[in-house]
């Protein structure tokens, strides 16, 4: 089943390599693109960009790929403020229109 999102775009950031991948039906689609390009799973974090919003309202740090107890992240939301800040910085760099 193909899912079309009209209000947001799914994305994944590699906080070590400083790159992001956007789009796909699932966060795992962008995750696979980065992993296939040499990223390590421990550095990949999922997020959502909300269309029509700006600033902090435009980004959400939630994805099923963020669940990783071995890295002390037990839920879908990125719990580590340092990791969240790195993801935010990358999204701001690559999508400056968001005004992050």
Feature map (PLM): residue ranges:
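Generic structural hydrophobic/aromatic packing signal, biased to beta-strands
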Residues: 8, 12-15, 61, 87, ...
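Amphipathic, interaction-prone secondary-structure segments
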Residues: 25-56
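Well-ordered alpha/beta subsegment
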Residues: 76-100
